[in-house]
Every structure is written in C-alpha cells, then in structure tokens.
Amino acid sequence: MKKISAPTLLAGVLLSASLAAQAANWYPYAAEQTEPAFSDTGVKKPVNYSPLPKAAKKWKLCVSFPHMKDAYWLGVDYGVVEEAKRLGVSAQILEAGGYTNLNKQISQIEDCVAGGGQAVVIGGISADGLVNLVKSLKAKNIPAIDVINGINSPDLTAKSLVSFYTMGQEAGAYLAKKHPAGSAKAVVAWFPGPAGAGWVEAANKGFTEAVKGSSLEVMAPIYGDTGKEVQAKLVEDALQSNPAIRYIAGTAVTAEVSQGIVRARNLKDKVQVISFYLTPDVYAGIEKGTIMASPADAMVIQGRIAIDQAVRALEGKDLIKHVGPKIVTIDKANLKQIRRDDVLPPASFKPLFEVK
C-alpha cells in the first residue's frame, strides 16, 4: 500500500476544506430580479440571492441539459450537483447530445418523471419546442424550472437565467466602443450558435442592435451547433471567403477554436476574438491575450439557483420567479478583480450525472 506523506495529506485536506468553504459561502449573491416575471421587457432590479439552508426532505429532481460537449454546461452541472448536495436532495442529470435532439430531450424528461422525478430543471434545446411538455408538467403539479437557455412558456414555475439579449448586447457594445461612427470600417464575423435556440436568437438580437451606429460591418449570422468541429469549420470557411475580417465574435466554443485557427493562419496581428459568454478556456484565453473579452453570466450560480427554486417550489416556500446573476464583462484589465469560483467550475471537475 502506497504511503501518503503528511504534507500531501495536509494539502488534500486543505483543498477539500477550501472547496467546501467556497460551496458554503456562495451566497448571498449579487443578482437581478426581473419584474414582471417571464417578460422580455421586464424591469431588472438588484437583489441579493440567498438559498434555503437545507431541504425539508430528500426530494428527487430531474435535470436536463442540451448536451455536455463544452465547458459551459460542465459549469452548470457543477452548480447543480453542488447545490443538490448542499440542500440534501437527489438529482438525475440528463444530456440530450446536442441541439438537434429535441425529441430526445423531451423523452428523457418524461422518462425521468415517470421514474419518480418530483421537479424538473430544464436547460432547453428549443424556446418553443418544449412548451407542450412544460404544460403537461404543470398539469401533473410538477414544478418546471427554466435554466440558462429560455423557454417561452407561461406555465413555468420559475426561471434561473440571465438575458442572452444582454450578453450579446454587452459583447457588441464592447466592440462598438472601439469603432465609433466615423472611424475606419471593421468587418465582424458573427457566430451566434445553433439556429432556433432561444438563447441564440436573443444573443443575436442584442449583438446586432448594440453595433448599430458604429463603424462595424457585421456579416450575416453564421449559425451552427456548438460542437468544436462544427464551429472550427464555420470559422475556417468564413476566414477563407472574407479576408477583410477583423473580429471573430460568437459562442465560447467559437472563441476557443478560433485561437488556434488565427495562430495557424498568422492572423494574430489582424484578427481578434470575442465571446459572448464565459468558459474556462475563454477565461484562459483572456489571461493569455488570445481572446479580447467576454461577458460573464456565472453559469455555476444559475445552476445553483435553479436547484434552490425547485426545492422552494416543492416545499411551497417563497421564491423569486425570474432571477439571474448580475452580468459583468471581463477582459485582461479587470480579470483579477473577478472571483473565479463564482463564474466557473474548478479545473478538476468532471461531469456528474447523479446526486444520490
């Protein structure tokens, strides 16, 4: 049997204690409540979000994600898992394999509920394609929480998300500030993600509206799944067809794959990259200077809040129906002012699909 040295053992204990302290100390968290709830034009007001200390019983939750192909959803998974553990509830975590698999997501949720799931947290593949499912859940008195992506249903119990309109708007405004009206034209290749997804259409609208009146010339949206191979091909094709491109803007996966493509094509001094949401690789890119900036929506916290909302709904306790973390745009200038553990999962975290 291999012996563990005292310093190594102590380091492990201290790391575990540190992670436990971070989990316990995530709240109160600076967030924004939307009123009226579920309104695209609702007014946002500041709120310090605090969850329940513990669940009254070991509820069984179903949690559904579009996929776990990128670090963004890994971060949501981390938030969901840690909050379920902290509250003392069980969770089955499902992933549908991609944004083309709406029917699979629906059947996974239905199967989980049939297996005894008492509340559902949904990172929706489609804003409109899950409306009937949410309606049927309400008819069965099963709370449905909309996390991250957005579902267009009045039958939802609550939403834990930020406005991806605002995320796109923040990214667009960051670029527009560098290129005011009257300055030299700059071409932007824009990759908002998979067509039809609620978060994509919202981000696209926010981005395109933010750059109006600037000297930026934004190409028509280049849609596609957020798998790395898909995004890499889209970026390669865009750079090949339009040598005038100065900026690559889009999903975190777009930004991640663009770093290597820009370097391989010797375009580091000509083409810059910006994401409209943060992942660990985007964060690392900002640190290295290969990615300019990204709004941060604290996906870990969104996952945590969604689990708390589900438990509150099951226990008939007060809940904020529409809430999300306050958005901040991160670049190299302010990177060190942001607490990493609030906005990203630990580097060592691996996907977990069950909390018992």
Where are these regions (language model features)?
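An alpha-beta-alpha
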Residues: 61, 65, 80, 170-216, ...
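Extracytoplasmic "Venus flytrap"
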Residues: 30-50, 60-79, 83, 87, ...
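Hydrophobic alpha-helical segments within soluble ligand-binding/sensing domains
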Residues: 105, 160-186, 199-202, 230-232, ...
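Hydrophobic alpha-helical
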Residues: 119-139, 207, 224-285
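Flexible loop/hinge segments that line or gate small-molecule binding clefts
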Residues: 25, 128-166, 177, 187, ...
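Hinge/cleft segment of the Venus flytrap/periplasmic-binding protein
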Residues: 24-59, 191, 195, 211, ...
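Exported/periplasmic ABC-transporter solute-binding proteins
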Residues: 246-247, 255, 259-326, 330-340
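Gram-negative bacterial Sec-dependent N-terminal signal peptides
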Residues: 1-22
